[in-house]
Amino acid sequence: SGGEPTARKDLEELVNHASKIGLYTNLITSGVLINENRLKKLYDAGLDHVQVSIQDTDPNNSEKIAGFKGHQKKIETCGLIRKVGLPLTVNAVMHRQNLHNLKNMIELAVELDAERLEVAQVQYYGWALKNQTAFLPTREQLDKATIIVEEARI
């Protein structure tokens, strides 16, 4: 809802300043506009952490939910984040259209060497509020998801 921060040309400068004054810096990104060189520059500027949003483990459904093709780029970016030495969180907004892939999402986060998987729910405002029936999980989906999460807890 706040826009893609990697579109900013001065992002490294902002990260550097924030780091110098003692702030924790966390880049929340779609992961599609960034490359290894930029990640290295952000790391050198003092970036502490990166969070990448992945809509689903199924590329077609992921791109349908996101509204653009970029699933493979997101996966590649996660690998680059780890390669440059930054901690990674995978952010997965789970809902009726992708909750059936929750176990796969957990497995993907492990495969990507993510420190964390943030399982979030849809923020019901604006378009999502008007179309909430397309997102609200069924009781059966929630019950299954609860079991999956409990089994995966470390």
Please state what every model-predicted region is.
Residues 1-59:
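Conserved SAM/AdoMet-binding glycine-rich loop
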Residues 24, 40, 44-45, 49, ...:
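Radical SAM enzyme [4Fe-4S]-AdoMet core and its adjacent flexible, acidic
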